[in-house]
Amino acid sequence: KNKNTGFKHLVLLFAFILCLFSCVSAKAANYYYEDGYKYTLSLGKATIISYVGSDTDLTVPSILNGKPVVKIESSAFANNKNLCSVILPDTITSMGISVFAQCENLKSIHYPEGLDRIYYRTFA
């Protein structure tokens, strides 16, 4: 009888844990679109997720939707064959992995002095 009770407790514990995980919901990110940029807003700041424009000489905006652009997410400009030069605004402080990967025509990039985090493989 003790084995059976232990098994029932184990099943109940497993069911409880499963219920906990299924009840937790992740808040979906709200994406915004402006001038070829897909971005998110959080805590009064904008993060660029991707760029689908066709500019060859691109000046990334310092403001999107009235909020300062502080981060460029991983692979945001990756595989963009049009980009030849990019100017990043002074508001950018962080760039993710492979932001400019496979941008084979990119010859120059101006980045702000305040940029304190560039992850590995930003250009590869």
Task: Give the label of every model feature segment.
Residues 36-44, 53-71, 81-94, 103-119, ...:
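Structural signature of tandem-repeat unit edges
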Residues 20-33:
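Sec-dependent signal peptide cleavage junction
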Residues 7-10, 28, 108:
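Intrinsically disordered, low-complexity regions enriched for glutamine and histidine
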Residues 48-49:
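Short beta-strand motif preference
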Residues 11-22:
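Bacterial N-terminal signal peptides
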Residues 1-6:
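N-terminal secretory signal peptides that target proteins for export/translocation
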